[in-house]
UniProtKB/Swiss-Prot annotation:
Residues 553-562 have a biased composition (Pro residues). It is found in: Cell projection, Microvillus membrane; Apical cell membrane. Residues 31-450 are extracellular. Together with the tyrosine-protein kinase SYK, enhances production of the cytokine CXCL8/IL-8 via the NFKB pathway and may thus have a role in the intestinal immune response. The chain crosses the membrane at residues 451-471. The gene is CEACAM20. The lineage of its organism: Eukaryota, Metazoa, Chordata, Craniata, Vertebrata. It is a single-pass type I membrane protein. This is Cell adhesion molecule CEACAM20. Belongs to the immunoglobulin superfamily. CEA family. Residues 1-30 form the signal peptide.
Length: 596
């Protein structure tokens, strides 16, 4: 409103009296003029209008007319947001006036939800909103004056708005709020509503006893875990709203345990699983390798929930140690480290001589000397070792092979096989052992004894055959004498002389003297005296793993046959034509004695 309107408000509202009371008629020259200077007069006060231009200046007295106070009404006086239409009515006795509307002492700014009648006396709010609540007034105005009605209040009911449940003592984790077991938690439901709402709380499908917008639970346990709901209701709007909040109670953490999928782990196996076992449910899991956080890779992979560690292509250096840690925002607990036992090998097999570390392929050793061979291979668990000699059925078990006294029979190729029963693998290698020393007869003592016995047996058979022939030839002359009488006078032949000698054609020269044997040769078995045998190791050295009680490759025992004693049945007074044959090495002797 400008300055001119303000002046008019004070002055143009003054009405001059329609008739002037004068006691005399003023001369024609007299004129009624208004002083341009503002008068210090207020509304409804008497105003003095001076008349200038006459010798006597009479005074004219008048009074301004007041505007009537308008009245206001609303229908309905209480409205529901987004539902009702509200109409305001302004009534006044004055005419030739304009109506202005005021809300909360401010001129109303009209918008699309409002309608105004042509005379301005009816104001309609088509769809009422909560911001339409407040006091309303109408004001009647003319050129100089205005008059405002008493205020009227519009009550707009609304709500409840969407409910938000807050937990003061919890920690949000996504859509879940976590609280520690044993602590306290306070719930608060926030919403906007007029009039205030009624609150109903639920835990799962159970109705709680709390009916206010806030409540507290002390000493929280796992029983207090779940989905909380708050139902707010407005009895005026007949509307309701439901808010939800999921609460997770974090229990006191216990130590987890790392459990492998198998205890018999073998190198190069396809995979092995390590599981972090814990009785706690709502926890996070983190893995550690050798005390440091584990970094996943193609070789070490984690499951979606981090509770399983998968080791692909198990290697011997994947022993760990491994540990897992369970945690929440309130506490942590880590397992004891687990060291894996991974079986592998055997790797390449090595044969060394005694305590030497260099691998050898050929060994020369003196005859009758001792020899120690060591076989080893990298393996877990330790490998089992088996020794064999080429072209021999004997075997020896253990890392070490000890030969106390080398003989010619120990010469050859020795094989050592290392095996691992858990991995199912075996590897072997060999070494050539050459026994060197002074050469002896190519025949063993047993072979020589056999040859001697064979020769003597042939001699014995030949002697018996010669004796038989001699007897037969000796009997032939007597038959001729009986048949031919001319022989009866012949002289007897002395005992020293033999009437008939076998011809050189019937006996070989070697057996020409057998005819002198008078009697049958008898063969007797003579038991040899007890001789000490060659001594071998009967107990493996302490380095042997199995402690076998047999010695490696004991040479086959020499065939010991009882000695033959050839006893002649010829007369004792006949001179012996054979000497005693003694073979000291096999302790076998043969004696041929002539008959007496």
């Amino acid at each position: 409103m400008g300055p001119a309107d303000s002046w008019g408000h004070h002055w143009m509202g003054i009405l001059l009296s329609a008739s002037l009371c004068t006691v005399w008629s003023p001369p024609a020259a007299a004129q009624l003029t208004l002083n341009a200077n503002p008068l210090d007069a207020t509304q409804s006060e008497d105003v003095v209008l001076p008349v200038f231009g006459t010798p006597r200046t009479p005074q004219i007295h008048g009074r301004s007319r007041e505007l009537a106070k308008p009245s206001i009404a609303v229908s309905p006086g209480t409205a529901i947001e987004q539902k009702d239409m509200v109409t305001f009515y302004c009534t006044t006795k004055d005419v030739n006036i304009t109506i202005h509307w005021v809300s909360n002492n401010l001129s109303i700014v009209f918008h699309e939800r409002m309608q105004l009648s042509k005379d301005g006396k009816i104001l309609t709010i088509l769809i009422v909103q909560r911001e339409d609540s407040g006091t309303y007034q109408c004001e009647a105005r003319d050129a100089l004056l205005s008059q405002r009605s008493d205020p009227i209040f519009l009550d707009v009911k609304y709500g409840p708005d969407p409910v938000e449940i807050k937990l003061e003592s919890g920690v949000a984790s996504g859509e879940v709020v976590e609280v520690m077991e044993g602590s306290s938690m306070t719930f608060l439901a926030e919403t906007k509503s007029h009039p205030p709402c009624a609150y109903t709380w639920f835990l799962l499908d159970s109705i709680l006893s709390h009916t206010t917008r806030t409540f507290t639970i002390h000493a929280v346990s796992r029983e207090h875990e779940g989905l909380y709901r708050c139902l707010v209701s407005n009895s005026a709007t007949h509307l309701s709203s439901l808010g939800t909040l999921k609460v997770r109670v974090l229990e006191t953490l216990t130590m987890p345990q790392v459990v492998p999928s198998s205890l018999n782990l073998v190198e190069n196996a396809r995979s092995v699983d390590l599981t972090c076992q814990t009785v706690n449910q709502s926890v996070n899991v983190q893995w550690f390798l050798s005390g440091q956080p584990l970094l996943p890779s193609e070789h070490l992979q984690l499951s979606a929930d981090n509770r399983t560690l998968i080791i692909h292509g198990l290697q011997r250096n994947d022993t760990g140690p491994y540990a897992c840690e369970v945690w929440n925002w309130g506490s942590r607990a880590r397992s004891e480290p687990l060291e894996l036992t991974i079986n592998y090998g055997p790797d390449q097999v090595h044969i060394t001589r005694e305590s030497a570390s260099e691998m050898i392929s050929t060994i020369e050793a003196e005859l009758n000397s001792s020899l120690t061979l060591q076989c080893w291979a990298e393996s877990k668990p330790g490998a089992e070792y088996r020794w064999t000699l080429e072209h021999s059925t004997g075997e020896h078990l253990g890392e070490q092979l000890i030969i106390r006294a080398l003989t010619w029979e120990h010469d050859g190729i020795y094989n050592c096989t290392a095996s691992n029963s858990l991995t199912g693998l075996a590897r072997s290698t060999s070494v050539l052992v050459k026994v060197v020393g002074p050469q002896s007869s190519s025949l063993s003592s047993g072979a020589i004894a056999g040859i001697v016995i064979g020769i003597l047996a042939v001699i014995a058979v030949a002697s018996e055959l010669g004796y038989f022939l001699c007897i037969r030839n000796a009997r032939r002359p007597s038959r001729k004498t009986t048949e031919d009488p001319s022989h009866e006078t012949s002289q007897p032949i002395p005992k020293e002389e033999h009437p008939t000698e076998p011809s050189s054609e019937s006996l070989s020269p070697e057996y020409r003297n057998i005819s002198q044997l008078q009697g049958r040769i008898r063969v007797e078995l003579m038991q040899p005296p007890d001789l000490p045998e060659e001594t071998y190791e009967t107990k493996l050295p302490s380095a042997s793993r199995r402690g076998n009680s047999f010695s490696p490759w004991k040479p086959p025992p020499k065939p010991l046959m009882p000695p033959l004693r050839l006893v002649s049945t010829v007369p004792k007074n006949m001179e012996s034509i054979y000497e005693e044959l003694v073979n000291p090495e096999p302790n076998t002797y043969i004696q041929i004695n002539p008959s007496v």
